[in-house]
Amino acid sequence: MNSCQQKAMEKLLHGHGCANQLLIMDQTESDSSMEREDLAKSVLHCFSDALSILIDTNDHQDDQSNNSSPQDSSPVLESSRKPLHKRGRKTSMAESSDYHRHESSTPIYHDGFLWRKYGQKQIKESEYQRSYYKCAYTKDQNCEAKKQVQKIQHNPPLYSTTYFGQHICQLHQAYATFPIDTSDFEEHEGSHMIRFGHPNISFSSSTSNLRQHQNHQDRIKDEYMKPVIAEDWSPSQWMSSEVALAVEAFEFNPFWTSHDLSS
């Protein structure tokens, strides 16, 4: 027991003694009203002093905890900060308004873009792993487009492909809209597109609209992605710088005909 607690205890004991004396006077029917008043005041003062001591002691302990050194509190602060920071990284991509989610009966790997897988992990409350991809031109052309692929249902099979960001790489500048893989839409007409963050653009789940969209993209490919003559072809226009150097070293042109190769 520290000194403050000892003082408070002494005050309480003294007040308790005064209260007992006051009780005895009531039982003996003493006529000394002045003595009764003094004892009652003593009881109140003792209790007030004891309460003041206890309150001051509690306030002093709170001040010490608030003024503790950063070294003493750093483990607690770090442990409380890290989960918040980690949650921020996990939700930053999901909270982005510029993303599209597509569900289909088979995973979409060939969607008209070049991707590089950079991770795969098990997701909580899901028995299927999620794969993470980023644009193959992230370093060469600072394209930050990403996508996630995950199986979400076994029977019937259902896969979710989520796209984040927009492609800015030159290879895909011809694509003005979000690419859709319609290879299995003939057999699975229940596949549908969900798009967020662009209220002025809507995608219908009907097969006819999807076929029209695919035909539109085919025309874009024919117009923008094929050179008119073989001599106009340059590897640096269609692939990363490392691959382009290798192709140029072998003097290879994919648009040469058999006549060009034999001459």
UniProtKB/Swiss-Prot annotation:
One GO biological process term: defense response to bacterium
Annotated GO CC locations: nucleus
Positions of the UniProt region annotated as Disordered: 59-104
Low complexity bias (residue ranges): 64-74
Matching Pfam families: WRKY (PF03106)
Gene Ontology molecular functions: DNA-binding transcription factor activity; sequence-specific DNA binding
Entry keywords, A to Z: DNA-binding, Nucleus, Transcription, Transcription regulation
Classification via SUPFAM superfamilies: WRKY DNA-binding domain
InterPro entries: WRKY_dom, WRKY_dom_sf, WRKY_plant
Record feature DNA-binding region, as residue ranges: 104-174
Superkingdom: Eukaryota
Localization of this protein: Nucleus
Record's note on what induces expression: By salicylic acid.
Alphabetized PANTHER family for the sequence: WRKY TRANSCRIPTION FACTOR 21-RELATED (PTHR31282)
Family: Belongs to the WRKY group III family.
Its biological purpose: Transcription factor. Interacts specifically with the W box (5'-(T)TGAC[CT]-3'), a frequently occurring elicitor-responsive cis-acting element.
Descriptive protein name: Probable WRKY transcription factor 62
